[in-house]
Regions:
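Pyridoxal 5′-phosphate
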Residues: 1-183
Length: 183
């Protein structure tokens, strides 16, 4: 990480230069503790330059940011419904159509022959509806949360001398604010 707790892309580049064979780089799209956002396109470019597979955990970002998997050069993307008011226990994985995987567990033909077991139909439908609603009201929701967050920042700064904000709070996830209080 660099001084502002962003992923150090130079270090990632250096690490990948020393790897032989297939490798998977997996990084959070948005950090849940300090709110930093990953420069996904830059990471994807670095990974492509080293023939590395790139997975991003988008749990904190899905439903709060528009993510176009056709434009972003991700190989894998995962998310979870509970972060945008979907059912707990329902999640998803996007796998780029150019990727060929073998099932980890043999069995039934669920999920295009990739997994065995009964599908959680209610969870899947609920997750689909939750993501639909999240994006339908994304702009209004974001404006409301940003207004509350900015008010909180302003009040903390005016009421508590020496208060600090961790991470890249001005350019980070608008739903997260990590605060340091003076001793």
């Amino acid at each position: 990480l660099n001084d502002n707790c962003h992923v150090n892309l130079d270090h990632l580049q250096e690490l990948l230069q020393h790897v032989e064979g297939p490798v998977l780089v997996t990084l959070m799209y948005a950090n849940n503790e300090i709110g930093n956002l990953l420069p996904v396109d830059k990471v994807a470019e670095i990974c492509a330059g080293h023939n590395a597979y790139f997975h991003s955990d988008t749990v904190q970002a899905i439903g709060h940011y528009r993510i176009d998997v056709q434009q972003t050069k991700l190989h894998f993307l995962t998310g979870s419904g509970h972060k945008f008011h979907g059912p707990k226990g329902a999640g998803f994985i996007y796998i780029n159509s150019n990727i060929r995987l073998k099932p980890y567990i043999a069995g039934g033909a669920q999920e295009r022959n990739m997994r065995a077991g009964t599908e959680n139909v209610y969870g899947i439908v609920g997750l689909g509806k939750a993501v639909e609603l999240a994006y339908e009201y994304l702009d209004e929701h974001r404006a409301h949360i940003e207004e509350i967050r900015n008010h909180m920042i302003s009040r903390l700064q005016s009421e508590i001398p020496g208060v600090g904000f961790n991470g890249d709070y001005e350019n980070g996830l608008y739903t997260v604010l990590n605060v340091s209080f003076p001793p």
